[in-house]
Structure formats: structure tokens, C-alpha cells
């Protein structure tokens, strides 16, 4: 593309192709007039690739060419850095956000890792823009921090939020066959480490609900789900809601993260983490261990099977913490090694931001209470981490995934025009 006319044609082509992101590879000197129309028409994020063909010019060989025309051509091959300030200037004056990758075309791992992260971030933004998030039931009464503006969620991430009723799940549950229940119980024994205290009756209850959840997810093409419902005074709904944990754990493991307590913000965070391929399990503070300088974090309800340290245990609980009824629950720790925490934070000024921290899941004693829980260590220490994290006003839930992906989340925030704060 070396004329303004070709640039306009390219811009129309990119719009028709419905691209999510543009990579502008500056190969040599280019007039900004051959670039601006492309980006103006495409109206998508642009990454300027300021890539040199090599680490340096062979000065001796260059100066021995004895042909000024050839010398100019060879110099221009290394001239990609020259027009980048011009292009950046025009983008800024045109109100176009841009990002840069500076490095070498070949043998530059750091550079191409960065390009790869931009591609991953664009993919996740696309997933979120097309995601159907189910919101089933109602908010946990009195838990003010988790309430959110649904319109703001869709305006920021895109996608669709389907408001759903527990009654429908209870209705589907009644249609599940004995054969479906038997098959799902067998699945449970293959996937989970089931404690002897778990009765066949409870396993069958959970299996019926799990199969019904699959039907509900299929009907609404859900990519994530937030749920909570007391079910008090309605035996069918109480039966449903006291037997959802195993089924929700299976959904979470299969790319449909499920957040309890109707935590829609955290369902979004979990979907982001899962779309990056790092898991995304529902978690909150459990306790501080000042002796070992670690934080215990976890939650009741579903866990993410694919990021568990070993096989997830299933335990029978005679009472649910803050929930109606009794039934089966899962107990797991997140795989030992690097982890990333993510919270979608709703700001007082009416915007969403992404709060991120990188740490380590470490071995050690945890609470055997039939919940997910792990021990986390942070580079800034447990005390400072908690203080700094809380200072940004997140809800008390967050999503945890394996690996350090803070830089990828920062790029996602840039693509979505969201503020990103990294605590550590």
C-alpha cells in the first residue's frame, strides 16, 4: 500500500472482512497518508510493528558497495524506525489509539512473544464480545459489593446477558431419565475422588441437576453463568439449588465458567481467564497466615477441575455456608506454581477496570471443609498484597488461573479501553 487510494481500498476491505485487530508492519519509509485511511476505515485497534530486518547494518559491507543508488535501497531496508514517529503523530492528532511493538523481524523472542500476546488478547476480546452469560436466580441479599450494572457490562465487554429463572432448571430436572442419571454418576466417579460419606442418593440428585444444567446451557448457548437462589418455600427449587455444585464444576471445566452468589462481575473475570487458557476458578479470601506469609483463598461451590492440584474431592456437607439445604461439595487446591488473580471492578465513576496480581500457589496445609482453597504467596508479601488489592475497591470475589498472564490482561484492557491495575 503506497498511495492514499490504495489505503482507502484496504480500509474498506478490512471493514468488509470484519477484522478484530490490525498489525501495521512498517517495512521502510512510508508516508502517513498511506496509513491513516486504512486505520480510519477499519475502526479497530492497531498495533504498529516497528521491526528491523536485523540487529544492525553491516556498516563495512554497506560502505563498500560503491553504488549510491544501491546504498540508498539497502539503507531504506533498515529504515522502518524512521516513519513510526510520523505515523504515531498523525494517529494521536486523529484521535486513534495505537500500540507499538519494537524489535527485530528475526531472532527476537521477546518481540514475537509480545505480538503473540496481542493476538491472544484480541481473541479473548472477540470471545467476550460474542459470549452469552446466563444470570440465573437473584443476588445474595445484603452482599452490596457484588451488585453490578448489567448494561455497563455489555457496553464494556459486548456479548449478551440472559436473565434466567431457576424454575426452568427445576422443570428440566424432572425430565431427566434414569439412564442419564446413571451415566452422569459414572462420570462423577471417573472425574472426582468421591468420599465414602457421599450417599448414592446425593450423587443421583447431583447427577440429575448436572444433566439438567447441560440442557439449559445448550438451549441458551451459554458461555458462562452466574447463579444464586435460596429456593426457600419451594421444594423443587431447593432440591435443585442444593445439588448444583458438581454439575457447575463440570461446566466450568468445559469452558463454561460458573460463578456462585450471582457474581456477574466475577463470571466475566472467570470467562476472561478461561479464554486465555489459564482456568479461572471462583475464589475469595479465607484467612491470613502471618507465620508463613501466605494468604488462604478459596470458595464454596464449583471449582475448576483442569487447574486442580490432583483429583478434586467430593464431600458431603450437612449444611452449606450461607446457602439453603445440604448436599455435595467439591474440595480442591489450585495447581502449585505461578498463578494470576483477576477482578472486574466497578468504579464509582461508572466504569469497569481490571485488577490483576501475579503470585504463586504453594504447598502446605489447607482447610478440609469441602471447599476450594489454596495457599498463595506474593512478591510484595501477604500483608501489603491484601492492603494494596483492597485499596482499589474490588468485590470480595476474584478469579484465579494458572500461569503469569498479567501482561496479556494489560493488552486486553488496552483493546477494550479499560484501565488495568497490576498490584504485583
Where are these regions (language model features)?
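Short, well-structured alpha-helical segments in soluble
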Residues: 7-19, 35-38, 210-219
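Extended hydrophobic packing segments that form well-structured cores
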Residues: 323-424
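Long, internal scaffold/assembly segments composed of regular secondary structure
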Residues: 183-276
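Periplasmic-binding protein-like
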Residues: 19-28, 47-50, 222-228
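C-terminal catalytic subdomain
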Residues: 251-368
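Short Gly/Thr/Asp-enriched flexible loops that form oxyanion-binding sites at enzyme active sites
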Residues: 30-43, 234-248, 378-381
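Short, acidic/small-residue loops that bind anionic groups at enzyme active sites
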Residues: 37-64, 69-81, 248-261
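Cap/lid and interdomain-hinge subdomains that line or gate substrate/regulatory clefts
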Residues: 55-185, 191-192, 198
Amino acid at each position: 500500500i503506497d498511495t492514499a487510494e490504495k489505503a482507502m481500498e484496504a480500509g474498506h476491505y478490512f471493514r468488509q472482512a470484519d477484522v478484530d485487530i490490525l498489525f501495521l508492519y512498517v517495512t521502510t519509509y512510508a508516508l502517513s497518508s498511506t496509513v491513516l485511511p486504512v486505520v480510519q476505515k477499519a475502526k479497530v485497534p492497531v498495533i504498529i510493528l516497528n521491526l528491523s530486518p536485523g540487529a544492525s547494518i553491516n556498516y563495512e559491507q554497506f560502505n563498500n558497495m560503491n553504488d549510491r543508488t544501491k546504498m540508498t535501497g539497502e539503507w531504506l531496508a533498515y529504515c522502518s524506525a524512521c516513519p513510526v514517529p510520523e505515523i504515531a503523530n498523525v494517529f494521536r492528532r486523529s484521535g486513534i489509539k495505537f500500540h507499538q511493538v519494537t524489535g527485530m523481524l528475526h531472532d527476537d523472542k521477546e518481540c514475537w512473544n509480545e505480538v503473540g500476546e496481542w493476538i491472544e488478547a484480541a481473541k479473548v476480546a472477540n470471545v467476550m464480545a460474542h459470549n452469552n452469560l446466563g444470570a440465573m436466580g437473584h443476588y445474595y441479599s445484603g452482599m452490596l459489593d457484588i451488585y453490578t450494572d448489567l448494561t455497563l457490562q455489555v457496553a464494556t465487554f459486548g456479548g449478551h446477558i440472559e436473565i434466567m429463572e431457576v424454575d426452568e432448571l427445576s422443570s428440566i430436572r424432572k425430565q431427566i431419565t434414569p439412564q442419564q442419571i446413571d451415566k452422569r454418576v459414572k462420570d462423577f466417579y471417573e472425574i472426582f475422588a468421591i468420599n465414602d460419606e457421599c450417599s448414592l442418593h446425593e450423587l443421583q440428585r447431583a447427577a440429575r441437576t448436572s444433566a439438567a444444567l447441560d440442557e439449559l446451557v445448550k438451549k441458551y448457548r451459554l458461555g458462562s453463568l452466574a447463579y444464586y437462589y435460596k429456593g426457600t418455600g419451594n421444594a423443587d427449587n431447593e432440591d435443585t439449588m442444593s445439588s448444583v455444585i458438581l454439575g457447575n464444576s463440570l461446566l466450568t471445566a468445559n469452558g463454561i465458567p460458573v460463578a456462585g452468589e450471582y457474581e456477574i462481575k466475577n463470571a466475566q473475570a472467570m470467562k476472561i481467564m478461561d479464554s486465555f487458557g489459564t482456568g479461572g476458578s471462583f475464589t475469595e479470601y479465607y484467612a491470613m497466615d502471618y507465620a508463613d506469609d501466605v494468604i488462604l483463598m478459596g470458595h464454596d461451590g464449583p471449582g475448576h477441575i483442569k487447574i486442580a492440584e490432583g483429583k478434586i474431592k467430593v464431600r458431603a456437607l450437612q449444611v452449606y455456608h450461607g446457602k439453603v439445604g445440604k448436599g455435595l461439595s467439591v474440595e480442591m487446591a489450585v495447581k502449585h506454581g505461578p498463578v494470576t488473580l483477576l477482578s472486574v471492578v466497578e468504579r464509582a465513576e461508572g466504569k469497569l477496570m481490571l485488577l490483576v496480581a501475579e503470585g504463586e500457589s504453594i504447598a502446605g496445609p489447607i482447610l478440609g471443609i469441602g471447599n476450594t482453597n489454596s495457599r498463595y504467596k506474593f512478591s510484595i508479601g501477604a500483608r501489603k498484597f491484601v492492603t494494596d488489592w483492597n485499596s482499589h475497591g474490588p468485590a470480595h470475589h476474584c478469579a484465579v488461573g494458572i500461569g503469569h498472564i498479567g501482561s496479556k490482561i494489560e493488552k486486553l484492557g488496552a483493546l477494550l479501553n479499560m484501565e488495568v491495575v497490576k498490584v504485583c
